[in-house]
Regions:
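Non-catalytic accessory segments flanking enzyme active sites
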Residues: 46-50, 55-57, 61-62, 67-70, ...
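Beta-strand C-termini and the immediately following turn/loop, strongest in propeller blades
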Residues: 59-64, 74, 116-129, 134-135, ...
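Predominantly five- to eight-bladed beta-propeller fold
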Residues: 78-92, 98, 145-159, 170-228, ...
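Short loop/turn segments that connect beta-strands within beta-propeller blades
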Residues: 75-76, 136-139, 217-221, 268-271, ...
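Beta-propeller domains
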Residues: 188-196, 201-324, 333
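Hydrophobic h-region of N-terminal signal peptides that target proteins for export
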Residues: 8-18
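A short helix->beta-strand "capping" segment at the edge of beta-propeller domains
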Residues: 20-44, 98-105, 223-229
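Serine-hydrolase catalytic core recognition
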Residues: 247, 395, 400-715
Length: 715
């Protein structure tokens, strides 16, 4: 009998020792941010692009353990000295007299007031759908300079004068009906009754404004229209025309509806329109990545991913020729500075990722074995001449770089780090990358003393068995390799960027806290995300439900094969917005792998979400692919455990998208949980939803009851 009691007590103690999702774990989870806060010294460097002491000085601040300190740096020799905050006397000024507009609102462009650069006493205003010339600010005596504007086709007053003050370039707008989303604020703060409101919100398939470039000859009071609209007929948007040097031509950009064609167009003062640059792709042109700088009247610097990666090109108007400036196995990100002469000779400073990363790396064999190949997403800075020669790497260290350049672009302050490498801040020459001075080296000893451990970078092939996926693995601080840990993936796979953190970040909001409950939390960039190759990204086309899941599953399986404590039979997933759509999609389309999902504010049917994001990746017109990718249409497939959350005032994704999923799940007789957050906007769930998410995964994947909420009080 005594032996049986001893065995029972031993078993109970063993189970208690292996418990996860305990009150202590919850307190650790809720306290990780505070635990990590303020424990990295001289690492969070903030460079201010202010030059109060002239072009030879830069300023930066950092945290030294007792507070924020500011330094001035001589960009030529690297000498620094502590100073007061150079912005201490600066006061933020708010614009007065203007109206506030929501970012989804399409302005009617009737409130412009364009000053004549050649005659400051003149300006153009909009009145009765036409343009009027105002002299000496006497609006009452304004003279009509157009007569044919009407409600169905009016002149925009958001235009530009020619430098000589004779011409005014603008657009005529044929307005389309507006689409509105209706909101109910159920529990306003200062009243009992709900508040109802509407928000302008165009959705896929909606009609759009039609825009026609036009030039008004103010001197002769005549209008010059394009002789043909063929080159910009089926438009998603036409930008306002801009004057070229000499005031004889204008340029504007045309973005085709469906985004398969993008053109930079030129119009002369006779109404002739010609194509300068054209981008075309049978799937889509990611127009938000296009970038253009008119260097002078002859040359244009242009960024395009036509080669399969984003690169820079120099367009010569005289020769009508587009010549590569950059090329190769990297992806140009941002253009920092460009200088040129009339003949197109000069240089450009830019950032890019992926250069030299032909071999994307292999999985590490253990936690302490580093990956020798550089992360292809790391950002570096380069300088190259506009003839495509003399490429100079300005940031040689294998790390992710964040640079701020001096006023004249002679030098730059660069902070580089990685998930596992603490930040180092240096001053370098912008001409050749030569190290001028090391300014700061982060001290993370306090952080390490707290028990903190960095996430691990893990690399494994995706669906094709050869293209490597890069991600991170976060373990709890009390990690015990003898235990079994469920896996939770944090997902956001929306095309247009990459999302796995690359900088040294002690507290990873989407991973660190949740891991403390007794989970292994992972995040990776799979196919459908950006900055590798266009083919890598375009898996998403008319196929957002893919979300890189074949790659994600392969990567997680590879990690679990490497680390047996990762329990591949208990995999959860969570995300917000597009990540909310993807989290639910994981349960609907891959139920054999994902067993539990938390989906917040998801765009669960792309027909319900904002036009510009969804038509970019799903195409136009709206077709059956929208239905095939819809979580609403596929709700009957649900097998795993699901928690949905939405803010009733979500002004990013129409909350009805979540309500429609709820309705479809009810009709399909599916068991699930739903959290409606009164007054909340676009959110992962705020504090309440975060706590519910913790409990949901503890119950669903750990199979244990979470501690009562009133027990979770700080010690």
């Amino acid at each position: 009998m005594k032996r049986l009691i001893l065995i029972a007590l031993t078993a109970a103690m063993t189970l208690q020792g292996q418990a996860q999702g305990t009150r202590e774990d919850y307190l650790n989870a809720f306290g990780t941010r505070e635990t990590c806060s303020g424990k990295m010294l001289n690492g969070d460097v903030w460079v201010r692009p202010v030059h109060l002491a002239g072009a030879d000085t830069m300023y930066y601040s950092t945290y030294n353990g007792t507070g924020t300190v500011w330094y001035s740096v001589n960009i030529h020799n690297g000498e620094k000295q502590q100073v007061e905050n150079p912005d201490r006397n600066r006061q933020e000024r708010r614009r007065g007299g203007g109206s506030q507009y929501h970012w989804m609102t399409v302005r009617d462009e009737k409130d412009g007031r364009a000053q004549n650069p050649a005659d400051g006493s003149q300006c153009i205003i909009h009145r009765n759908n036409n343009l009027y010339l105002v002299t000496d600010n006497n609006d009452q005596a304004a003279t009509a300079i157009t007569q044919d504007g009407k409600d169905t086709c009016y002149y925009s007053s958001w235009g530009a004068w020619s430098a000589d003050g004779r011409y005014y370039a603008t657009v005529m707008i044929k307005p389309a009906p507006k689409h509105y989303v209706t909101y109910t604020m159920s529990s306003p703060r200062n009243q009992v009754q709900p508040i109802y409101s509407q928000l302008e919100y165009a959705k896929p398939g909606d009609s759009l404004n039609y825009r026609i470039p036009v030039v008004v000859d103010v001197q002769e009071q005549r209008t010059i229209f394009p002789k043909s609209t063929q080159l910009f007929a089926s438009q998603y948007n036409v930008t306002a025309p801009q004057w070229d040097e000499g005031c004889q031509t204008l340029t504007f950009e045309f973005n085709e509806r469906g985004h398969k064609t993008f053109r930079v167009l030129e119009m002369d003062l006779e109404g002739n329109v010609r194509t300068l640059i054209e981008e075309h792709n049978d799937k889509y042109v990611a127009y938000s990545r296009n970038w253009r700088q008119d260097l002078n009247s002859r040359f244009i610097l242009w960024k395009s991913d036509r080669s399969g990666r984003a690169h820079l090109y120099l367009y010569d108007r005289k020769k009508d020729r587009l010549t590569p400036v950059t090329s190769g196995d990297y992806w140009v990100r941002d253009i920092i500075h460009c200088e040129t002469d009339a003949k197109g000779k000069g240089y450009v400073i830019f950032s890019a990722n992926g250069k030299g990363c032909k071999n994307m790396g292999k999985p590490a064999s253990s936690m302490d074995q580093s990956i020798t190949e550089e992360d292809p997403y790391n950002i570096h800075y380069y300088r190259i001449t506009l003839d495509g020669k003399h490429l100079v790497a300005l940031t040689p260290e294998k790390a992710n770089h964040r640079a701020t350049f001096s006023r004249e672009h002679e030098a730059f302050i660069d902070t580089y780090s990685s998930i596992t490498q603490a930040p180092v801040t240096v001053l370098r020459s912008a001409k050749d990358g030569k190290l001028i001075a090391t300014l700061e080296k982060a001290d993370i000893s306090r952080l390490e003393e707290s028990g903190w451990k960095p996430a691990e970078v893990f690399v494994a092939p995706g669906r094709d068995g050869k293209t490597d996926m890069w991600g991170i693995i976060q373990r709890p601080r009390n990690f015990d390799p003898s235990k079994k840990y469920p896996i939770i993936e944090y997902i956001y796979s929306g095309p247009g960027s990459q999302y796995v953190p690359k900088d040294f970040t002690p507290w990873l909001y989407n991973l660190t806290d949740l891991a403390e409950l007794g989970f292994i939390v992972v995040q990776l960039d799979a196919m459908t995300t950006s900055y590798r190759t266009l083919d890598f990204e375009q898996v998403c086309y008319k196929n957002l439900k893919d979300a890189g899941f074949p790659d994600r599953i392969a990567w997680i399986k590879a990690a679990a094969a490497r680390y047996p404590y990762m329990d591949i039979s208990r995999v959860g997933i969570y995300g917000c917005s597009a990540g909310g759509q993807e989290a639910l999609g994981a349960l609907l389309f891959h139920p054999e792998f994902y067993k539990a999902g938390y989906a917040a504010c998801g765009c669960h049917d792309n027909r319900m979400d904002k036009i510009w994001w969804n038509e970019q990746w799903m195409g136009y017109p709206v077709d059956s692919s929208y239905i095939e990718c819809s979580n609403v249409e596929n709700a009957h497939r649900l097998q795993g455990k699901l928690m949905l959350a939405v803010g009733e005032m979500d002004d990013n994704v129409d909350p009805s998208s979540s309500y429609q999923v709820v309705n479809a799940l009810i009709k399909a007789n599916k068991d699930f949980e739903f959290i409606l957050l009164p007054g909340a906007h676009h959110t992962m769930g705020e504090y309440y939803g975060e706590h519910k998410r913790y409990d949901f995964f503890v119950k669903s994947l750990l199979g244990t009851d979470p501690p009562a909420w009133d027990e979770l009080k700080k010690k």
